[in-house]
Structure formats: structure tokens, C-alpha cells
């Protein structure tokens, strides 16, 4: 994940 996001569902890699 490129950016530290609190919610994995919002992560770019997840999308």
C-alpha cells in the first residue's frame, strides 16, 4: 500500500 490509510477498504491497492 503506497499510502498509510486507516481503512484497508479505501486503500488504492484494494480497489
UniProtKB/Swiss-Prot annotation:
It comes from Zea mays (Maize). On the 2D-gel the determined pI of this unknown protein is: 4.9, its MW is: 37.6 kDa. It comes from the Eukaryota. This is Unknown protein from spot 45 of 2D-PAGE of etiolated coleoptile.
Amino acid at each position: 500500500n503506497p499510502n498509510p490509510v486507516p481503512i484497508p477498504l479505501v486503500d488504492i491497492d484494494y480497489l
